[in-house]
């Protein structure tokens, strides 16, 4: 890495380990992705255990809760990765994967979409809560979604760091002093300083997640189920929407002159769903607080 007067030249290797004597390569993106999921899982389990109370002790132990959430985190990858891949193929791949179907399974060549990963995680939370709720009553669908919303920023931040190391999802040209000149960018123009939009987006997700984590920590039942998910979806969609303005070409929906990117279009349903969920939670809490008249 070399720092110029007006930009930072980034020529760091995309691999943590890449030896000619060994066939195994360790890319930074894969490491960041794995560590992000691991850290988010550990934080989620810790957060769930912080809400464990005397009422829960009557039905299940803290160890049972921890074990169930470990299974949830482990098997979530079977939904996150395929969901991310399918969404990328449908919304960003164009005709390439239809002409080259063998490339669909080559995830190691890149091509994951975060919106698809979120949908995969939501589907897994729905299935998991259906299977486990009778054993551990606290593991409702909204409880799991609130947990994921509270810790997602850790994974999202690490994944965007991986994108940065991989020199992909490159920003638009900038004259700002922290502009980055990537040595081999996946998009954009070579040798031009660009916004480090991966860092903008990743740090924004992390900040949002920190706020949601502290809103949830030992206060889950007071806040009410669904609120954290609602705030998370609204926040994620807004961050993604505005981050797209700093990115180079990434899947224009109609043509090169389209005002919106595919990422912005896909963020709109998340925003609407999060807003509707927030309204539903507000009305539900308002109904609980309203005084009931008794007949005498």
Curated annotation (Swiss-Prot):
Its main location: membrane. It is a multi-pass membrane protein. Signal peptide: none annotated. It is found in: Cell inner membrane. GO terms for molecular function: phosphatidylglycerol-prolipoprotein diacylglyceryl transferase activity. One of its GO terms (biological process) is lipoprotein biosynthetic process. Keywords: Cell inner membrane, Cell membrane, Membrane, Transferase, Transmembrane, Transmembrane helix. PROSITE patterns: LGT. GO terms for cellular component: plasma membrane. Pathway: Protein modification; lipoprotein biosynthesis (diacylglyceryl transfer). Its EC number is 2.5.1.145. The keyword Transmembrane helix applies. The chain crosses the membrane at residues 28-48, 72-92, 110-130, 139-159, 197-217, 226-246, 263-283. A 1,2-diacyl-sn-glycero-3-phospho-(1'-sn-glycerol) binds at residue 160. Belongs to the Lgt family. Catalyzes the transfer of the diacylglyceryl group from phosphatidylglycerol to the sulfhydryl group of the N-terminal cysteine of a prolipoprotein, the first step in the formation of mature lipoproteins. PANTHER family: PHOSPHATIDYLGLYCEROL--PROLIPOPROTEIN DIACYLGLYCERYL TRANSFERASE (PTHR30589:SF0), PROLIPOPROTEIN DIACYLGLYCERYL TRANSFERASE (PTHR30589). This is Phosphatidylglycerol--prolipoprotein diacylglyceryl transferase. It comes from Chlamydia caviae (strain ATCC VR-813 / DSM 19441 / 03DC25 / GPIC).
């Amino acid at each position: 890495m070399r720092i110029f007067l007006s930009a930072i030249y980034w020529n760091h290797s995309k691999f943590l380990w890449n030896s000619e004597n060994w066939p195994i390569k360790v890319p930074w993106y894969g490491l960041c992705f794995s560590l992000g999921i691991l850290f988010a899982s550990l934080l989620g389990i810790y957060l769930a255990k912080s809400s464990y109370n005397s009422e829960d002790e009557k039905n299940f132990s803290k160890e049972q809760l921890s074990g169930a959430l470990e299974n949830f985190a482990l098997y979530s990858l079977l939904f996150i990765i395929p969901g991310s891949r399918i969404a990328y193929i449908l919304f960003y791949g164009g005709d390439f994967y239809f002409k080259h179907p063998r490339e669909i399974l080559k995830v190691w060549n890149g091509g994951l979409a975060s919106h698809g990963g979120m949908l995969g995680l939501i589907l897994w939370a729905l299935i998991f809560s259906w299977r486990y709720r009778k054993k551990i009553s606290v593991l409702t669908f909204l409880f799991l979604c609130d947990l994921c919303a509270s810790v997602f920023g850790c994974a999202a931040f690490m994944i965007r760091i991986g994108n940065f190391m991989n020199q992909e999802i490159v920003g638009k040209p900038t004259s700002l002093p922290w502009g980055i000149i990537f040595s081999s960018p996946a998009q954009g123009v070579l040798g031009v300083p660009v916004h480090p939009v991966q860092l903008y987006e990743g740090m924004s997700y992390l900040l949002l997640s920190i706020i949601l984590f502290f809103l949830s920590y030992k206060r889950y039942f007071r806040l009410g189920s669904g609120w954290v998910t609602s705030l998370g979806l609204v926040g994620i969609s807004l961050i993604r929407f505005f981050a797209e303005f700093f990115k180079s070409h990434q899947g224009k929906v109609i043509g090169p002159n389209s005002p919106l990117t595919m990422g912005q279009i896909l963020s709109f349903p998340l925003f609407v769903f999060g807003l509707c969920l927030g309204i539903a939670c507000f009305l539900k809490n308002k109904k609980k607080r309203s005084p009931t008249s008794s007949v005498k």
